[in-house]
């Protein structure tokens, strides 16, 4: 990861060491940013904690010198949230959140859950079913011909290959086909994401990563 560290040494100025990663245009302006390098979209509210995958990934990329913004639980019926940080320079990162959205929204008997520990107030009214698909489609709808969309997190990881869908009682294709995203990183993907970010930043073909 020497190129990552070199990028960090050249570009890293850490005004965020004791604050949150930006979630609004006003917060970006306060940091003097015209554009984020990476925007992470999550089915959870943004909690700056080592227990939250998106926060960990965001802080890791920040330490390497990249400008990272986070959109937590965007409104999926309008453009007001997904467009508030603009378009990233390198890629979008999309996660359904810390819990698979279908598990977060329904019990094993398919009854809707009224509570969500990762939503402000604890009320389950912010996370859509199949959040990864919804957020990816939201980006595609409002940003035509955008930079790559990278999927990660438990929801995408569990659906990375052909799989049985309990909710629809049928086999489903890998989520990359249904979502029309570009890349999927599964499991503990910090190293892979570092390599991917370096490749995209250096304008090299990420398909050659091994």
Could you say what each language-model-derived stretch is?
Residues 1-2:
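Short, small-residue-biased leader/transition segments that mark boundaries at the very start
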Residues 6-15, 64-65, 116-128:
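Acidic/glycine-enriched edge-of-secondary-structure segments
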Residues 9-12, 41, 79:
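Catalytic cores of nucleic-acid editing and processing enzymes
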Residues 26-29, 40-44:
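Long, low-complexity, serine/threonine- and charged-residue-rich intrinsically disordered N-terminal tails
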């Amino acid at each position: 990861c020497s190129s990552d560290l070199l990028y960090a040494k050249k570009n890293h100025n850490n005004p965020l060491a004791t604050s949150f990663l930006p979630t609004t245009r006003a917060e970006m302006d306060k940091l003097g940013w015209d554009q984020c390098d990476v925007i992470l979209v999550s089915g959870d509210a943004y909690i700056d904690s080592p227990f939250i995958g998106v926060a960990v990934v965001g802080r890791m990329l920040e330490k390497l010198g990249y400008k990272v913004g986070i959109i937590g639980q965007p409104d999926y019926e309008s453009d007001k949230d997904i467009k508030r940080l603009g378009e990233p320079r390198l890629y979008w990162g999309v996660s359904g959140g810390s819990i698979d959205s279908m598990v977060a929204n329904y019990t094993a008997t398919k009854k809707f859950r009224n509570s969500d520990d990762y939503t402000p107030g604890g009320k389950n009214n912010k996370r859509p079913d199949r959040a990864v698909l919804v957020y990816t489609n939201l980006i595609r709808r409002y940003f035509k011909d955008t930079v790559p969309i990278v999927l990660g997190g438990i929801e995408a990881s569990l659906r990375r290959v052909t799989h049985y869908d309990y909710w629809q009682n049928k086999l489903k294709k890998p989520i990359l086909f249904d979502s029309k995203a570009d890349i999927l990183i599964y499991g503990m993907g910090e190293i892979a994401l570092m390599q991917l970010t370096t490749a995209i930043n250096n304008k090299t073909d990420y398909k050659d990563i091994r």
